[in-house]
UniProtKB/Swiss-Prot annotation:
It comes from Caenorhabditis elegans. It is an enzyme of class 4 (lyase). Belongs to the COQ4 family. Pathway: Cofactor biosynthesis; ubiquinone biosynthesis. This is Ubiquinone biosynthesis protein coq-4, mitochondrial.
């Protein structure tokens, strides 16, 4: 077990407890993806130190990523002015993010707080991943239906190497209807592999400083070619 509680929400776990929680949360999350608490627990308990450290190092090697690690900005109701976002022009990242949240009737604070990470630097990496997941959907122009989620999970799995993302892509893909599974294999997967490989590292991007830009401009900065362009 960790020697001490490192932050307010921290729940130190003994190795056996971590393993059991990881297995249990994985089984539940795979069978019922709507269980956000189990998806979050699975993500944290399976995010082994070397994977998070690799993400941290990649962020540190990027000018913007290094600043993010230093300043540790958060994306929450307290830091995002949603009223201002709603007033932004159509097509901007901020307006699309606002529409995304409104459509799902959710908020930035709906993301579970990290609890099971035993390293303060890795804590921020995991929290940042969680808080920027919605921007990945927007940048890739992927819906929050099963096909869209699986496509995003494959992107994140390739870019970040997080076991939860890899597992979510594989098992989520297996749960798709035959038609959607074929669409994933024939169209989305080849595209998302190319995008994840060639795009800028999403974890080292300061999304909150680009709200007033058109999505097409943000995609250009990220080196993302929308799937619709290839159709």
């Amino acid at each position: 077990m960790s020697a001490q509680k490192l932050y307010a929400s921290h729940v130190p776990l003994a190795p056996l407890s971590r393993m059991l929680l990881g297995i249990g949360s994985a089984v539940t999350a795979i069978s019922d993806p709507k269980r956000g608490d189990m998806v979050a627990a699975m993500g944290e308990t399976t995010a082994i130190g070397p994977v998070l450290e690799n993400i941290r190092k990649r962020m540190e090697s990027d000018v913007v990523g290094k600043r993010l690690l230093l300043e540790k900005p958060r994306i929450s109701n307290g830091t995002i002015d949603r009223k201002w976002l709603r007033q932004l022009p159509d097509g901007t990242l901020g307006k699309l993010y606002s529409n995304f949240l409104d459509r799902l009737n959710t908020s930035p604070d709906a993301r579970p707080t990290v609890k099971y990470i035993d390293n303060l630097e890795h804590l921020y990496v995991m929290q940042r991943y969680r808080e920027t997941h919605d921007f990945t959907h927007i940048a890739l122009e992927q819906k929050t239906n099963m096909l869209g989620e699986v496509t995003v999970k494959y992107f994140e799995g390739i870019q970040y190497g997080l076991p939860m993302c890899v597992t979510g892509g594989i098992f989520g893909g297996a749960r798709l209807l035959t038609k959607n599974r074929q669409e994933l294999v024939d169209r989305n997967l080849p595209w998302v592999v190319e995008q994840a490989t060639n795009a800028r590292f999403f974890m080292a991007f300061d999304w909150e400083n680009h709200f007033e830009k058109q999505l097409s401009e943000v995609q250009k900065e990220l080196n993302i070619t929308p799937l619709s362009v290839n159709m």
